[in-house]
Amino acid sequence: MGGTINAAIKQKFENEIFDLACFGENQVLLGFSNGRVSSYQYDVAQISLVEQWSTKRHKKSCRNISVNESGTEFISVGSDGVLKIADTSTGRVSSKWIVDKNKEISPYSVVQWIENDMVFATGDDNGCVSVWDKRTEGGIIHTHNDHIDYISSISPFEERYFVATSGDGVLSVIDARNFKKPILSEEQDEEMTCGAFTRDQHSKKKFAVGTASGVITLFTKGDWGDHTDRILSPIRSHDFSIETITRADSDSLYVGGSDGCIRLLHILPNKYERIIGQHSSRSTVDAVDVTTEGNFLVSCSGTELAFWPVDQKEGDESSSSDNLDSDEDSSSDSEFSSPKKKKKVGNQGKKPLGTDFFDGL
């Protein structure tokens, strides 16, 4: 790292921040470990962060939030098995669903809007993916039980489809309008922790998957069976993992790691270009998002929230070009990129590859 990295705004809270989402004009939603969801107006020039509203949204932790495309509503899911839709300007709840008390609760791990501000998807700790329509009384319109570990991310594409990544090392491609079983990748022998699309202006769009080993694997859209490239860990540590990924531009990603750093990663050629920011505690980056205007990256780690200028040039990573791998040399990973899986998983009950469902997607 080549110098001091200064945050435009940095603030500590009493409780841990589990998720965040930027929306509207200089606004950010925060979901906390104590179940509260709060909305803040930020002014980087004045170095201010002003609470607009705050509410006790869940009895237990608020684990994930998602704002719809129009910025008018958001969904929050909690470890209490409750899902709520609310107005972003007031926090007032418009819809609520509760897991059947007679069933064993598997907490929701992730939620994401998919289509037309009406359809969204959830994933839970047991690997279940559900598609919801807020216009229906029961909410859920179809469910997929193809994974055997938690769902770590849901990434929509082309209006009706989405990719779900799982701790079991398998990703699934699902059509929100179709009840057929999803396309499943081969098991990757690495815990998938997050995912995001990139190279979206190119004919061969890529999907990047972060792993617990610190490796990022690239899948080609339409060829979901196995990864085509591997990008090795940016640091030499067996304890480093990729925790969160979000789009920077058509060819780059912001990558949050377990060391508290957010790095800019260029895709094809694959190179970690520089560190955007580093949290004070140097603990796991829990969530990242780009402000609506695109000039700041917002991240959280533990109780700390920070705003980082995306054009800040300190923190170049000159050695990152050495940490590359591809499908042509996948057996020559460096010694510090060995897989670090959460648990031993299998591929029992998975749909075999070779199906023609989603051809070309």
Curated annotation (Swiss-Prot):
Subcellular location: Nucleus, Nucleolus
UniProt xrefs under Pfam families: WDR55
Keyword annotations from UniProtKB, A to Z: Nucleus, Repeat, WD repeat
GO terms of biological process kind: ribosomal small subunit biogenesis
Annotated region (Disordered), positions in chain: 311-361
Record's protein name: Uncharacterized WD repeat-containing protein C1A6.02
Gene3D superfamilies noted in UniProt: YVTN repeat-like/Quinoprotein amine dehydrogenase
InterPro entries reported for this sequence: WD40/YVTN_repeat-like_dom_sf, WD40_repeat_dom_sf, WD40_rpt, WDR55
GO CC terms of this entry: nuclear pore outer ring; nucleolus
SMART domains given in the database record: WD40 (SM00320)
Residue windows of the WD repeats: 57-96, 103-142, 146-184, 187-229, 237-275, 280-318
Recorded superkingdom: Eukaryota
Major subcellular location class: nucleus
